[in-house]
Design a protein with these regions (language model features):
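Residues at secondary-structure transition points
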Residues: 9, 13, 17, 42, ...
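Short, low-complexity, polybasic intrinsically disordered segments
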Residues: 113-137
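Conserved catalytic cores of phosphodiester-cleaving nucleases, focusing on short active-site segments
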Residues: 26, 47-69, 88
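Acidic active-site catalytic centers that drive phospho-/nucleotidyl reactions
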Residues: 19, 44-46, 59, 108
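Acidic-basic catalytic patches of nuclease active cores, encompassing PD-(D/E)XK
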Residues: 1-38
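Catalytic cores of nucleic-acid endonucleases
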Residues: 2, 62-115
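Active-site metal-binding core of divalent-cation-utilizing nuclease and nuclease-like domains
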Residues: 28-57, 137
Length: 137
């Protein structure tokens, strides 16, 4: 295990697993990663990706799940309240002020569901993408 991975909490490890899976899913759709875990105006943007037409700011929410088990705390995206949406929008606006672009900006949300297997390992069970999740809100 690399020194970088040795010093993170289990929660951070699962979060990173989710972000990696989402970055790969977007790559399959023709997007390239511009930045990861970027701090802008005291807010963090999980992923910034781009293709020929869009610059996408992605908030990734990762949760453990078991098949056919309801979530104790609701769906992962439900953790993004009004204040979090405002911080995401401000971070995206501040990024665009510092990095002007002709690409169309968009804020997406990704839910990642991770299974904990009997042998103690974990794998990504499902990814749900919500493009333009907060357009006009």
């Amino acid at each position: 295990m690399s020194d970088l991975l040795r010093n993170i909490t289990p929660r951070q490890r699962v979060g990173r697993m989710g972000e990696d899976a989402v970055a790969m899913r977007y790559a399959e759709m023709g997007f390239a990663v511009v930045a990861r875990n970027l701090h802008v105006s005291r807010n963090e943007i999980d992923l910034i990706l781009q293709n020929e037409t869009h610059l996408v700011f992605v908030e990734v929410k990762t949760r453990h799940t078991a098949p056919h088990t309801p979530f104790r705390f609701g769906r992962p995206a439900a953790a993004i309240d009004k204040d979090k949406r405002a911080r995401m929008r401000k971070a995206a606006e501040d990024y665009l002020r510092e990095h002007p672009t002709s690409l169309q900006p968009r804020i997406d949300v990704a839910e990642v569901y991770v299974n904990r297997l009997p042998d103690g390992t974990e794998n990504v069970a499902e990814i749900k993408l919500f493009p333009a999740a907060y357009a006009g809100r």
